[in-house]
A protein has these predicted regions:
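Generic hydrophobic alpha-helical membrane-segment signal
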Residues: 36, 69-72, 90, 94, ...
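Active-site flanking loop/helix segments enriched in acidic
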Residues: 13-14, 34, 38-42
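Short amphipathic alpha-helical coupling elements at transmembrane boundaries
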Residues: 28, 32-36, 85, 89-92, ...
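A feature for the membrane-embedded catalytic helix bundles of lipid/isoprenoid biosynthetic enzymes
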Residues: 2-31, 100-234
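Membrane-embedded alpha-helical segments that form the functional core of polytopic membrane enzymes
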Residues: 41-97, 114, 133
Length: 234
């Protein structure tokens, strides 16, 4: 694949050097196609949002076939979520508002997915506990989003604070065992979560994500309270 660079040569789309996240391998092949279209990064983010919300709606229907469709739509959503940043850098259209919009969409999709999955599982089994597990996971995602907003608001006026663009392009590498645990947790629960969802949907067992999400979402926002957990490019 021929390399693509930004007009000033400051950014070049390169092949992923690591196995994870898997969606990065998909976006690496999709971004050159989107680059040729008259789409802005924010429009790509909006497409990602539509795909993700449609996926959440599919899970709310509570059937196996709709679950597979929902999982596929989530893969599209997460892939486009990678593409928007790559398009922003290639077209030199990165902006603080675009980063904030991207964060907002991430929260919307996470919350909608768990709420939809919880409702769909409740509807198909008659057990309302599944619904409350979904709500707990969505609440955890909401708390994490609020923590991120507070973090960025506090660091905004600090001279040494990084911009959203610098945070996105400054790839942090794990240095010790604790770093690797946090790194893998963030990768699997964030960047490649859609692949896990699709895999489980193929066997009609996405319900297992509800208790895991109800607990894991709380663990995610708790780790985000600490500086050590921040900076992973997922």
């Amino acid at each position: 694949m021929a390399s693509i660079s930004s007009p000033d040569g400051s950014y070049t789309l390169t092949a992923p050097a690591q196995a994870l996240p898997l969606t990065r391998h998909l976006s690496y092949r999709l971004t050159p196609l989107i680059y040729r279209l008259p789409l802005t990064p924010n429009q790509v983010t909006a497409l990602s949002m539509l795909a993700g919300l449609a996926g959440a709606w599919c899970f709310a229907l509570g059937t196996a076939n709709w679950g597979i469709a929902g999982g596929a739509l989530l893969v599209v959503c997460y892939t486009l979520d990678n593409c928007d940043g790559e398009i922003a850098r290639l077209k030199d259209m990165s902006s603080e508002w675009g980063a904030q919009f991207d964060d907002l969409v991430d929260w919307m999709i996470d919350s909608a997915f768990f709420a939809g999955l919880g409702y769909g599982t409740w509807d198909s089994t008659g057990e309302i506990l599944w619904f409350w597990c979904g709500i707990a996971a969505a609440a955890g995602a909401t708390i994490d989003y609020v923590i991120d907003l507070i973090h960025h608001a506090k660091s905004k006026n600090q001279p040494e604070a990084k911009t959203r663009e610098e945070e996105a392009t400054d790839v942090r590498k794990p240095e010790d065992f604790k770093d690797w645990l946090i790194y893998i947790f963030h990768k699997l629960s964030r960047a490649d979560f859609c692949v896990i969802v699709l895999g489980l949907a193929l066997f009609d067992v996405t319900w297992v994500l509800l208790p895991l999400g109800a607990i894991g979402a709380q663990a995610y926002w708790i780790t985000d309270l600490f500086q050590r957990a921040r900076g992973w490019h997922t």
